[in-house]
């Protein structure tokens, strides 16, 4: 592991957030991803590999502690995996919100509205807030924000 970052709503002071911690783990290039994935699954995490629509990332994986039989999460931690040479827009977005309280307030209000609208439908909730996230990530990139926290 090269680096670990806490990002997401719980990393932003005053932000409305579910009790979920998002952790970004940056892996060294030479790591064997199959071995890493096996270590995580042996520790009780579920591994989800997903394609990157932007084609800027590779080896995108998330790890979560499995849901219980009745569909309730046991723990609220998502571990996002990236290789060290991959862009990290989620860090730029979180940094921008920490530095711009007015944008953080607007995002918090949007999240609250969408949570009421979509309830436990995570996919629709994520899709509905994506325009906001993309807009402020672009602003962070244009403003020359640092790549890391």
Regions found by a protein language model. Name each.
Residues 1-6, 10-18, 27-37, 41-149:
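Catalytic core of pol beta-like nucleotidyltransferases
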